[in-house]
């Protein structure tokens, strides 16, 4: 469909150049092309793929017509999710399936409004899962928030349709005046380094079950994700971890000396 009148350039404070779309394990090349076209229509230029099952260029370009072909030429392809989202300070997961382990926390429209202050100083990734099953719980654990598209009944949408809905809401929010900008948030590389450090220390002091450390770590992730952490706050938490690690090491040395002394016996 041709548009008779294009919208004027962005006048709000949501920075579209800081929005990235990440398609995780997409299966149908035509959906990749259609998603790129939807993104281009709404002013979003960053597209990444993670382990695409089929990325046959000829089929992709059938639906990525016109200028959106540039997005296909510039898109990045990754073997794992973390390298794809590592540079982003805020990550959004999308899902049609909601439940106790994946509570829907926002809608596309509310999300777009919430992103206005965040995008001033942070890059934001919006993740979409494979067509047949969506994002897994392992994918969603990297996300700051989970968004769900409300529907009247049948909740399954075509991948490109879902991308268009989110991109449209983000574009419309970019035309509205925004509030106070969020400072720079910790990116996913920094956050995952913190979580790894925290898990190692909590295992060392006996807080986590070494046979199943991820059980409590999932709860800790949820707790710490309620408010996006700034880079400075991540450094503080890692400083606490280092101090706990040092103290645990001192206790271990002290216990070792006591065992050594006890083994010597009386003179």
Predicted regions and their residues:
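Post-transcriptional modification and biogenesis factors for structured RNAs
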Residues: 1-267
């Amino acid at each position: 469909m041709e548009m008779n009148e294009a919208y004027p350039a962005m006048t709000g404070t949501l920075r579209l150049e800081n929005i990235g779309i990440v398609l995780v394990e997409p299966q149908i090349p035509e959906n990749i092309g259609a998603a790129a076209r939807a993104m281009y229509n709404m002013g979003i230029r960053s597209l990444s793929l993670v382990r695409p099952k089929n990325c046959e260029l000829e089929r992709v370009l059938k639906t990525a017509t016109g200028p959106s072909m540039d997005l296909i030429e510039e898109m990045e392809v990754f073997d794992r999710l973390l390298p794809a989202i590592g540079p982003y300070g805020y990550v959004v997961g999308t899902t049609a399936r909601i439940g106790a382990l994946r509570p829907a926390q926002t809608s596309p429209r509310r999300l777009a409004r919430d992103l206005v202050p965040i995008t001033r100083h942070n890059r934001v990734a919006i993740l979409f899962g494979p067509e047949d099953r969506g994002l897994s719980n392992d994918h969603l654990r990297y996300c700051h928030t989970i968004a769900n598209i409300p529907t009247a009944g049948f909740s399954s949408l075509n991948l490109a349709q879902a991308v268009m809905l989110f991109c449209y809401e983000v574009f419309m929010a970019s035309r509205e005046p925004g509030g106070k900008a969020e400072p720079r948030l910790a990116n996913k590389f920094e956050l995952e380094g913190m979580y790894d450090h925290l898990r190692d220390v909590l295992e060392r002091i006996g807080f986590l079950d070494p046979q199943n450390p991820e059980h409590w770590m999932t709860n800790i992730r949820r707790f710490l994700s309620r408010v996006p952490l700034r880079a400075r706050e991540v450094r503080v938490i890692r400083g606490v971890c280092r101090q706990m690690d040092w103290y645990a090491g001192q206790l271990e040395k002290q216990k070792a000396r006591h065992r050594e002394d006890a083994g010597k016996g009386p003179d």
